[in-house]
Amino acid sequence: MTSEGSNTTGTSARPPGRGAGSGSRPVPASTPAPDGRPEILALRALKLGDLLVAVPALKGLRRAYPEHRILYAAQEWLRPMMPLTDAVDDLLPTHGLDDPLPIEHGRIDLAVNLHGSGGESRGRLEEIGARRRMGHRSPGWDGPEWRSGILERERWASLVSWHGVPADPLDCRLRVPDVENPAPDAVVVHVGAAYGSRLWPVDRFAAVARTLAAAGHRVVFTGSARERPRALAVADAAGLPAATVAAGDLPLDAFAGLVAGASLVISADTGAAHLASAYARPSVVLFGPAPPSEWGPPPGPHTVLTDESVRVGETFSATPDPALLAVTVDQVLAAAAGHGIS
């Protein structure tokens, strides 16, 4: 859950540039066809948690521009989340910033940089020839200065607010997907993470799950398909059957539905934790390299566990951050008990 971060990005007119539709390359068939409405393109080509902290800003844009079609530029696998935001109309499949955005030059009315404030994201948006732009202050862009050390929800809500689009950073709720919940009222133990720096040890997850299962709670282990072997290892160490492992088995909307109906979510600082926030489900969130002051949950039934005094903060490290390793099994069980799960 990272972006380019900080150099200085806004709503400003600009000279035409060359985008995917101006001769630089053909627009792929996966690009949504125009439907006659003016369009907003919000760029945030990152992961699930990054989308969820941008929801308040997206909802602000939806309210401010009810006649516009809002396209969200991000990876294709996030598509099932778009209708759940009640803000985004369609996804523009975008895998990072290495290639030009797959949209016709001059088609977009308003380009919004929710990706970061660096030269890469600005350059990709400048190429598409939008009539207006929103972003942080930087060369050629009007907008607020980039601020370090603030909550991401606040960052993006305050960005669009600066540009005249009121947004509430606590307006982060999602609609519950219209899918069957495979395990209502389960304790969801999300064992995966994008980077090793956020991987709490298998034996500790197993100890927590073993205790909660012995107390009569239904435990379900989640993660991506790539993380299924890790989830199976946790289940095995906890003495629980492979049937408790849903990692790799759930489409994204079904995963959202599982979290929306959970009795408790236990997770590192990942998309699963942000889903628990979006559905106001009780959660215990284990923080490693990312500070809770920037990525922590909103007010609600959420407990943050970490030791900031030993944080290294290397997100892309292959080894768990000391701030995460400082969290003990007993701390997690005590936090779960605080939410009525013991």
Locations of regions flagged by a protein language model:
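Catalytic machinery of carbohydrate-active enzymes
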Residues: M1-S342
